[in-house]
């Protein structure tokens, strides 16, 4: 049985190349805005359906379909740069996010040994740069603990 079916999530290594990770992170950091009233999480910046990330979702679609053995329809893209102190509360996704992917682009931590996991159910998963987790967003509760770093440090994620 596939890990997506068994565990409700599947870790995928090297879903994005290092060059693509660098390009996307550089783009997002240049366009960083903090304090957006629409951001439900403290200490974060985000964009929904920005042109570049919408293109990325379509670029990643064949890989995600291959990994899931499903024909999928992209609904939206979401890009977030979490800053120190951010937290993602435990939740399940809305119906449109039946199959989701969370891809770590890049991060900058005060301590190079620090790890900030995405928790799937009761399992903390450290997603390395360029890797991703495909998951059943409506079925498995997921969250992140408090990002225990000073505000000038960050973690960049694509959904």
Label each residue range with its predicted role.
Residues 69-78:
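A short coil-to-beta-strand element that immediately follows conserved catalytic motifs
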Residues 1-68:
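Non-heme Fe(II)/2-oxoglutarate
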Residues 148-152:
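Accessory, usually C-terminal, subdomains that scaffold auxiliary metal cofactors
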């Amino acid at each position: 049985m596939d890990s997506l079916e068994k565990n409700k999530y599947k870790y995928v290594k090297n879903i994005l190349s290092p060059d693509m990770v660098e390009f996307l992170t550089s783009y997002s950091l240049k366009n960083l805005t903090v304090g957006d009233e629409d951001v439900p999480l403290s200490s974060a910046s985000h964009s929904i359906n920005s042109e570049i990330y919408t293109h990325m979702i379509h670029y990643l679609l064949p890989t995600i379909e291959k990994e899931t053995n499903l024909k999928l329809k992209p609904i939206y893209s979401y890009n977030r740069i979490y800053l120190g102190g951010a937290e993602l509360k435990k939740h399940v996704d809305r119906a449109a996010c039946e199959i989701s992917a969370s891809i770590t682009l890049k991060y900058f931590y005060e301590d190079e040994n620090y790890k900030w996991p995405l928790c799937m159910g009761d399992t903390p998963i450290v997603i390395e740069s360029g890797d991703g987790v495909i998951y059943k967003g409506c079925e498995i509760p997921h969250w992140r603990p408090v990002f225990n770093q000073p505000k000038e440090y960050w973690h960049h994620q694509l959904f």
